[in-house]
A protein has these predicted regions:
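RNase H-like (RuvC/DEDD) metal-dependent nuclease/polynucleotide-processing core
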Residues: 3-6, 11-19, 23-265
Length: 265
């Protein structure tokens, strides 16, 4: 698979690149796949720095909820469909997202009260722990029109399910078996994944970025490269929130029975 290039008005060649992003202990970890054998990784403290660096990317796929309920809906349709395609216990990794108004709460208790008032459901601890990151991405998308077509939501377990031809991962991603299972799949779909992961593990301390964060971001980047013209979404026809942001989870499915080659970007 050849990577496209385009020329700007000044004649400079710009390679079409895809970026996969996942939140990590020190901010945001990203993987950029540029062209065959050319990749970059890094960590940024906030999401605006990622957008500033990669705003010319073909796509930025991020593991964070985009498109938030305001009231009346306790669960997005995309989250329900994601749980439906995943086997137990992977489906438990998809948890309800907070309503937009709860993102500004100062405490977990306050966020729970706000969320229950507008959606009828308290907030999970998992949702509260990423509320700050959800707010970062939400604020960026609402203030940059172009970002809305570039920064898109993914969920790692859905990505691996799709890359694995509709079969969920068998092991928890934080276990050794789970790490190896996911790495084997990524290496099959994108030869060179092992080198990317090995180099990243050698470069950054685990207190900065976890091993599972690296795998999740790489899965997003590989998905963006493999399916850049044919990404699918859950649901097929996404709902939009009150600000116009899509409530969707993107993926690229390698169909069962097909002779799907490994992705050579």
């Amino acid at each position: 698979m050849e990577v496209e290039e385009r020329r700007r008005a000044d004649g400079e060649v710009v390679w079409v690149s895809v970026v996969g992003v996942d939140g990590c202990r020190s901010g945001w970890f990203w993987v950029c796949l540029i062209r065959s054998g050319v990749w970059k990784v890094g960590i940024e403290r906030n999401f605006r720095q990622i957008w500033s660096q990669w705003h010319e990317a073909d796509s930025i796929l991020v593991d964070i909820p985009i498109g938030l309920p305001d009231s009346g809906v306790a669960d997005r349709l995309c989250d329900r469909e994601a749980r439906n395609v995943l086997d137990r216990p992977r489906k438990s990794s998809v948890f309800p997202v907070p309503c937009r108004l709860s993102l500004d709460a100062a405490t977990y208790q306050s966020a729970c009260r706000i969320n229950k008032r507008f959606t009828g459901r308290r907030l999970s601890k998992q949702s509260w722990n990423i509320a700050g990151k959800i707010r970062e991405v939400d604020e960026l998308l609402r203030s940059h029109a172009r970002a809305k077509g570039v920064v898109r939501e993914v969920h790692p377990e859905v990505l691996f399910w799709a890359l694995n031809r509709g079969l969920s991962m068998q092991h928890n991603k934080r276990t050794e078996d789970g790490f190896r299972e996911r790495l084997r799949l990524l290496e099959l779909r994108y030869p060179g994944s092992l080198a990317i992961v090995t180099s990243t593990l050698d470069t950054f301390a685990r207190k900065a970025v976890g091993r599972d964060d690296i795998m999740d971001a790489l899965a997003a980047a590989v998905t963006g490269r493999l399916g850049r013209r044919s990404l699918q979404s859950l649901p097929e026809h996404p709902e939009r929130d009150s600000t116009g942001l899509p409530m969707e989870i993107l993926y690229y499915r390698c169909e069962p029975g097909s002779e799907q080659p490994a992705c050579r970007a």
